[in-house]
């Protein structure tokens, strides 16, 4: 079974770009460990092609080379925070909510039409950080779009924003999971990886 991780820096996480079997040091690494533990006798091929800084339009532009030609059995997509993040700062790029929806829909539609992959959509998230409150407000308008598209196209939806909100009720320090509210540290990456493995377990089981 071939499982492809796609997305931005949260997926990239320092992976070796010369070796797409290198999982990097983020959630894919921990997801792979958890999946192998759940299915010790299964034959898996894990590929990580996340690229740091990517927005939805950039992922669409490389979708043929970095997904369709690979023909994964399962593809996971965690994308969107940069579409919001890049609205701010000196080199800001304005992606409207309408453009975001069109880009993300185009990604999912093309995957559905040109692969047989099961699609896992992971919601973007932003942990509470005072310096990022405007970004968080913008993210609130993006998340319903992701949920809507996941209902239309995804086989599994992981509401990571909601999952983190629940987790922070028992571990109320966002810094435990991330130093900047976006990029997970080792604790955050392990948490996301284990959440991922739990959510895709039934999907994997039914496709072995």
What are these regions (language model features)?
Residues 1-52, 57, 62-71:
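Serine-esterase "nucleophile elbow" of acetyl-processing enzymes
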Residues 3-5, 45-48, 74-78, 119-123, ...:
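Structural recognition of the beta-strand scaffold that forms the well-ordered cores
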Residues 17-22, 90-97, 134-137, 178-179:
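Short glycine-enriched, charge-decorated loop/helix-capping segments at active-site entrances
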Residues 49-51, 55, 84-99, 129-134:
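Surface-exposed cleft-lining segments at the edges of enzyme active sites
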Residues 67, 71-77, 81:
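Proline-aspartate-enriched helix->loop->beta-strand connector
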Residues 78, 82, 108-143:
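Active-site segments of SGNH/GDSL-like serine hydrolases
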Residues 95-122, 143-155:
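Charged, glycine-enriched surface loops/patches
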Residues 125-208:
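Catalytic His-Asp segment of secreted/periplasmic serine-dependent ester chemistry enzymes
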């Amino acid at each position: 079974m071939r499982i492809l991780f796609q997305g931005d820096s949260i997926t990239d996480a320092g992976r070796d770009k010369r070796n797409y079997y290198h999982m990097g040091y983020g959630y894919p690494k921990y997801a792979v460990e958890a999946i192998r533990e759940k299915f010790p006798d299964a034959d898996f091929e894990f590929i990580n092609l996340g690229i740091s800084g990517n927005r939805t339009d950039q992922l669409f532009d490389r979708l043929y080379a970095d997904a369709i030609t690979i023909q994964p059995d399962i593809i996971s997509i965690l994308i969107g925070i940069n579409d919001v993040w890049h609205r701010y700062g000196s080199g800001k790029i304005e992606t409207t909510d309408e453009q975001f929806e069109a880009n993300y829909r185009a990604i999912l539609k093309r995957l559905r039409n040109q692969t047989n992959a099961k699609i896992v959509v992971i919601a973007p998230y932003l942990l509470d950080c005072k310096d990022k409150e405007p970004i968080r407000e913008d993210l609130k308008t993006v998340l319903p779009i992701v949920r809507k598209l996941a209902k239309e196209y995804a086989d599994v939806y992981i509401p990571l924003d909601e999952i983190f909100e629940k987790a922070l009720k028992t571990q109320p320090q966002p810094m435990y999971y991330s130093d900047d509210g976006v990029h997970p540290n080792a604790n955050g990456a392990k948490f996301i990886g284990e959440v991922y493995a739990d959510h895709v377990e039934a999907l994997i089981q039914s496709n072995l």
